[in-house]
């Protein structure tokens, strides 16, 4: 079946797979949004769902008994970048520039970075919101050149990451550490 990357359709198909096709377990869909839509259905029927592509922290705070993940939640994806930068800086806090898309996954990554900044005594110098269809990061990168952070963190999925890498090179942005999803 094709969920068409539509959460409502994914939930309907989960219902069909369980109630009509009599599946005994499910492999989760791609993305946190689709997993969020399907999890209540699998819970309702007590059908285990093993997922490898839904990393939003909110999936793991709902108390689901039948949802199992094989990856870390999104808030833990890039916090190690901040901790590593601090370690390389002799244990002293670092300046962090952040730019995140406004989807659930990227916002969970952002929360993990904010936690790491606080935990390490680091400083947030840029906290930009990126559009869903990221085509241009120039405004953020101009600020990065001005503020000279120790770390730049970007969460914009494949297209956003490719855009960031291309524009960082084109604009000759020099940042000691770059971390991306």
What are these regions (language model features)?
Residues 3, 101, 180:
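Cofactor-binding loop segments of dinucleotide-utilizing enzymes, especially the Rossmann-like FAD-
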Residues 46-53, 121-125, 173-180:
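Short hydrophobic/aromatic-enriched beta-strand-loop microsegments
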Residues 1-61, 70, 130-137, 157-163, ...:
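Beta-alpha junction/loop-to-helix N-cap segments that form part of ligand/metal-binding clefts
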Residues 57-58, 65-172:
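Extracellular/periplasmic Venus flytrap/periplasmic-binding protein
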Residues 23-26, 149-152, 174-177:
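Short active-site oxyanion
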Residues 155, 180-181:
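Alpha/beta-hydrolase-fold catalytic nucleophile elbow
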């Amino acid at each position: 079946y094709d969920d068409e990357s539509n959460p409502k359709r994914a939930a309907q198909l989960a219902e069909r797979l369980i109630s009509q096709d009599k599946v005994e377990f499910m492999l989760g869909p791609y993305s946190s949004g689709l997993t969020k839509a399907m999890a209540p259905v699998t819970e309702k029927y007590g059908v285990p769902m093993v997922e490898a592509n839904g990393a939003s922290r909110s999936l793991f705070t709902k108390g689901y008994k039948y949802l199992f993940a094989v990856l870390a939640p999104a808030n833990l994806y890039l916090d190690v970048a901040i901790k590593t930068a601090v370690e390389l800086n002799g244990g002293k806090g670092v300046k962090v520039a952040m730019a995140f898309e406004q989807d659930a996954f990227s916002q969970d990554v952002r929360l993990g970075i904010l936690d790491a900044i606080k935990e390490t005594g680091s400083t947030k110098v840029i906290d930009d919101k990126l559009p869903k269809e990221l085509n241009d990061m120039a405004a953020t990168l101009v600020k990065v050149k001005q503020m000279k952070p120790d770390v730049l963190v970007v969460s914009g999925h494949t297209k956003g990451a490719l855009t960031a890498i291309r524009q960082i090179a084109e604009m000759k942005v020099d940042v000691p550490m770059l971390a991306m999803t």
